[in-house]
From Swiss-Prot:
Lineage: Bacteria, Pseudomonadati, Pseudomonadota, Gammaproteobacteria, Enterobacterales
Official protein name in the record: Peptide methionine sulfoxide reductase MsrA
Gene name of the record: msrA
Region (Disordered): 1-20
Superkingdom: Bacteria
Native organism: Dickeya dadantii (strain 3937)
EC number(s) recorded for this UniProt protein: 1.8.4.11
Amino acid sequence: MIANFDKTQPIGQSDALPGRTTPMPVARLHVVNQHSMTHVPDHMEVAIFAMGCFWGVERLFWQQPGVYSTASGYCGGYTPNPTYREVCTGKTGHAEAVRVVFDPAVVSYPQLLQLFWENHNPAQGMRQGNDIGTQYRSAIYTLTTEQETAAKESYQRFQQAMRDAGNDHDITTEIQPAGPFYYAEDEHQQYLHKNPDGYCGLGGIGVCLPPQG
């Protein structure tokens, strides 16, 4: 049955792996900037993005001024506290995602959205480049109504920018309220800092997000 399972097809909750009640252990500090991996300072906000393999996505965001911390994990699915191996089966419903804690006085949520749209291909469905499966889908998981509004508005602007550039593909990015974010195993946290020559499939399509009118 596993051999015939199509990892590009979304699953329902009744088909998801059971997972576990025990959360994944999380390192206390981010290895790049030594900030807390879990705490959100009072004046900061959280965003969650999925853009394919989370290794390159996490690096993209930790390099941005105003980003306090980043974490690789899983979001948008059903299985509680999944392992990486479980997510790779396509039977958890989760996407590989990155949790971004940021200071809105330094970098705004719309600026993070610009990084999101311009640094991956949001029109590939259940894949990102050579990485194939529902875990690699493009998604924005919103935590406030303001984030949801901004995400949907930027979606429309980027879709029009693609059309204007001669790209007639439809955006497949999933925009929905964030469910639980489950931290990935420690080996996946800040992976490209620990493994500078590691795999990074991140890349845009050469289209820029136009300024908000």
